[in-house]
Amino acid sequence: MSAPDSIFVRACKSQAVDRTPVWFMRQAGRYMPEYRAVRKQHSLLEICKKPALAAEVTITAAEILGVDAAIIFADLLLPLEVMGLPFHFSAGEGPVIERPVRSREDIARLETGRAGELGYVSEAVSLVAKHFAGRIPVIGFCGAPFTLASYMIEGGGSRNYVHAKKMMYNAPSDWDALMRKLVAVTTAYSTEQVRAGADVIQIFDSWVGCLSVEDYRRYVLPHVTAIVKALQKTGAPIIYFGTDSATLLPAMKETSADVIGLDWRIPLDEAWTRLDHACAVQGNLDPVLLFADWKELKTRAEDILCRAGGRAGHIFNLGHGILPETPVENVKNLARFVQEYSASASGFRPPASANSGSKTKSRKPKAGSPEPEAGVS
């Protein structure tokens, strides 16, 4: 770990901090001219596989935005290649899996002993950690088993996840075998990122919101929990993020992740209440609000901070990744506003909007005050 005492890492551990830490999912991406300049010369996978380039775009984004953490630039699907499942990106379609996994034989052919071939990601982590030298922490990440399996089985993105759910329902033993292989690979992959200098690991479960609570508990929860438990042995806090997951929050808490990432579809304080305030939370501004005028954007960010109420364990973020056409200045201004507002003793008042089912009491603590009062993102 390169920055174990940073406000971000401490917030992940639900420890008191002077202000709310902030970073953004997909903070290095197409909305930044600097990233687009690199992409003119290199493909996405080339950037991922060349540690110096991956480190460059990671560092550039964090420094331009002035955020409190740098998330390593990589692609969610990289582990699929070392399992023997090649993929490519198609314009307008996104990732395309060349040989979808649809049978027991397909699962049997998947390899689990080649995670070391992803060493280029760990090397990029090491370069970023050395550059920041403890000034800000580095976030490593991996895809969650369900989300990776969905891509593998569907052959790419999906609206209904018919093929993935068919395997879950009709061949549960095959599903579990696939999950176990994904747990092994993602655990090894993420552990190497921590060894290389990552302070925190985020597990992205981008498509988990398509599941009922019953299906989540049966087909997903045990496998995510296995990854979380294994990675926590490294000493790194674990963030578990899923979209459209409001109904799943109590079950997601059972993974024992240190932080649960929230999307924007549920008020922060209501979500934290559903989690019984048993962990830290991250979020949860709608990414599209970054296209709004400053007055509206500021009001919505302030509302989230007020719903956090100064409770220890809130990390400000979006409810999903930054969108490609987002104005860079809005992202920079938002980061600075969160930092300055949360550092002020007067920065916590009742929420401006009344769209939450839980009440937030007026108070004036420093951000990260340990006394429970309201919810978080």
Residue ranges and their predicted role:
Residues 1-91, 127, 305-306, 328-343:
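N-terminal basic, low-complexity leaders that serve as flexible interaction/assembly modules and, when applicable
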Residues 40-43, 103-113, 168-177:
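Short glycine/proline- and acidic residue-enriched helix-loop micro-motifs
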Residues 45-49, 107-118, 287-291:
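The substrate-binding groove and active-site-proximal loops of carbohydrate-active enzymes
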Residues 76-79, 94-95, 103-105, 145-147:
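A short acidic, glycine/proline-enriched capping/turn motif at secondary-structure boundaries
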Residues 85-99, 151-164:
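Short, flexible, mixed-charge acidic loops at enzyme active sites
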Residues 92-130:
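A gly/proline- and charged-residue-enriched helix-loop-helix capping module
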Residues 117-344:
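Active-site loop segments of alpha/beta catalytic cores
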Residues 343-377:
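Intrinsic disorder/low-complexity segments
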